[in-house]
Amino acid sequence: GDDRLNSRTFLRRVSKFTDKVKPVKSDFAMLDAQDSTVNRQLLLAAQILKSIDRDMPIRFLIAECDQASIVLSALALARYYGVEDQLDISPLFETPHALRNGGRVVEQMLEQPAYRNHVKKRGVIAVQTGFSDAGRFMGQIAAVLAVERLQSHLATAIAESGLTDMRALIFNTHGESNGRGSHPGTLTQRMDYIMSPWVFERFRSHKIALTHEFSFQGGDGFLWFGDDLLGEASLMQLLCARFKPTDTATQDEFYNDADFVWDFYNEVINQQDSLYHDDDYRYVLSGFARNFLIPSGSRPEIRQASGPLAQSTFTPRRIRAIPHNAILQQLAIPTNVIFGIGRAGRIDPNRFNMIFRNAPRGRTIMDMVLGSWQNTQLQVLAAYGDFQDPNFWISRAIAQGKKPTRWQYRLVAHQLYHRNANHSGLLWSAFRHP
């Protein structure tokens, strides 16, 4: 089980095994014969270093990583294919389990001699955090708090390991659950949202060099870098955001009331989890709104599943992040950002009001909630509900009189009667929780 894979004994065995691995010669024939994704990627890296650029560093991303043993195994394979010296292994923490336990995973990685020796050679400790996928799993607001906590734990783990002469590299994939670049504020506010001044101060206080990477993808790039003047202005905002003083960040009231923030965080997660398990919410996302979307890439919108999951009912967690966000925007109800905030605030309304109205970090987070709420239109959702109500189509059929098209309306109504048999009502019933 997972506990055994995370045990100190097992990790030490993997570390010792990694030290004993000898590199093999590889070629394109080996690459062509491989079916395993990880082997193909590392073999491709080997051929790039061999035939194109032997000095180029390569970032090796491990998606949905939640165990130190996975990183050590990737390191063993990198050594086997002879690419260890040019490879920075970057685990991506994006699932709820990974974000909650990412700090411990980093600690376990840094405890193992094989990994320590590797990062000493490379001079870099690289990780990646996912915002948009995390928002799909646990809600955007809980995700941003979990990501910040993980970033802080990384600084602590590096300091405690004695590797403060290494450079920490954090790449944030900041979809923010409303789409690329959806933060409602300025670029400076956006940068503070994905990595707070408090986190920068944590690394600075430990004397750890920090490289913060982020990307502008798709339309987000055109929005901020559409011409030379706009690009220069955007770069100036980014520089101002990253070189402003951070020494006062520790005085933020948001960090001085850890008990309330922790309770708030857990309640948002609980509310989001209850939403994902709501049958009516599943009904919403599996409706025809998904068919109105423009394809967002070469990958299918629904993740492929195997084993028992493949036979289970539809679950929102199987929708990829981009179409999931787009579906909620199509329905005008960005629940992955706003849902559960009110319930969490009821824990202590006075503290909630003070922290999220007055504390700088709290305001940064609440700006995202309020921006998403402005994009919420319950009338649009109700209209979709009418479309999935068979009575609506029956009324349309009656209005057709004796026209042949009346049978088309009746067919739609018939299909919806069967589809709705196991559900409690209209589309908007999924949002009955206040």
Language model features with spans:
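Acidic, glycine-enriched catalytic cores built around paired aspartates
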Residues: 1-30, 34, 38-54, 74, ...
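Active-site-adjacent "gating/activation" loops or surface patches in catalytic cores
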Residues: 40-43, 54-55, 68-74, 84-85, ...
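Long, structured ligand/cofactor-binding scaffold of large enzymes
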Residues: 46, 69, 79
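Glycine-rich, proline-tolerant flexible connector loops at the mouths of alpha/beta enzymes
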Residues: 58-65
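Flexible loop/turn segments at secondary-structure boundaries
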Residues: 65-71, 96-101, 133-138, 174-180
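Carboxylate/His-rich catalytic cores and anion/metal-binding grooves
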Residues: 75-78, 95-115
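Conserved, mostly hydrophobic/aromatic
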Residues: 91
